[in-house]
Amino acid sequence: MANKTRWIKSRIRSVNETKKITRAMYLISASKVKRLRDRLDSTRPYFEKVNEFMKDLILHGIKTPHILFEGSYKEGKKKIGLIVISGDKGLCGGYNANVLRSTISLYENLAKEADVTFFPIGVVGRNFLVRHGYQVEEDFNYQTQSVSVKFARLISQKIVKKYYTGEVHEVYIIYTKLVSTIRQEVTVKKLLPLDKTEFGIEDDKSDEMIIYEPDPVSVLDIVIYEYIKGIIFGAMMDSYVSELAARMTAMDNATKSADEMIQKLILKLNRERQAVITQEISEIISGAAALK
């Protein structure tokens, strides 16, 4: 009986220690979510301007076919690049599993008619893809928690260069969009070739003429890097905030589960104590009766 009581007390202490950790992780994630959302909001106006400029350039400047819209594929087997943004760590509910499930589903559809190469951002996603034998770009190794405009620029330069040289004919990005702190959605977006309807352009005919120096095509070849950089940066930020929000929810649920477990253990401990007291009282009564 005494051994069982000691075991329950030890179990309560253990669960309490775990609860402290999950509570701390919840608070850290909550703090980071707010900070990163503020950071994302502060950079959004710049990339919105880039998007507006791209729209004006397409509508009023680009009047001839261009590889960024027409595509670089001519013949043979098509080559497709998938940028996959996952987390760097676990303990975030189904966040990583949802991203990878959607990734493999998309891969299975695309791989029927094309060679698919993965460009993973995030340790969990990269390890998963390498472990299961998928074709992964070797020199493409970025962590989600290192999200910055600098990294987004490096990634956009690599991706656009591979598109121009024909190493990939299409590029998709898979990331997690934050709907709310308790809801995140895996999103797939086609990066290249560009789709004019993405800019709200149904008909690119326009009577207005804008002069671009040195010429519209040269300007587009420069601005495309800023445009792709903006999408990648936004996707990385959205994904990282989603990971933290998922971790917040997971750690909050874990803390609540720990509270429930502690209450059950305390109830069990009290019952054991009551049983000990009842037994001792019974022994005293039996002893007193024997003396009479």
UniProtKB/Swiss-Prot annotation:
It comes from Caldicellulosiruptor bescii (strain ATCC BAA-1888 / DSM 6725 / KCTC 15123 / Z-1320) (Anaerocellum thermophilum). This is ATP synthase gamma chain. Belongs to the ATPase gamma chain family. HAMAP family: ATP_synth_gamma_bact. It holds the Pfam family ATP-synt. One of its GO terms (cellular component) is proton-transporting ATP synthase complex. Produces ATP from ADP in the presence of a proton gradient across the membrane. The gamma chain is believed to be important in regulating ATPase activity and the flow of protons through the CF(0) complex. InterPro entries: ATP_synth_F1_ATPase_gsu, ATP_synth_F1_gsu, ATP_synth_F1_gsu_CS. F-type ATPases have 2 components, CF(1) - the catalytic core - and CF(0) - the membrane proton channel. CF(1) has five subunits: alpha(3), beta(3), gamma(1), delta(1), epsilon(1). CF(0) has three main subunits: a, b and c. The lineage of its organism: Bacteria, Bacillati, Bacillota, Bacillota incertae sedis, Caldicellulosiruptorales.
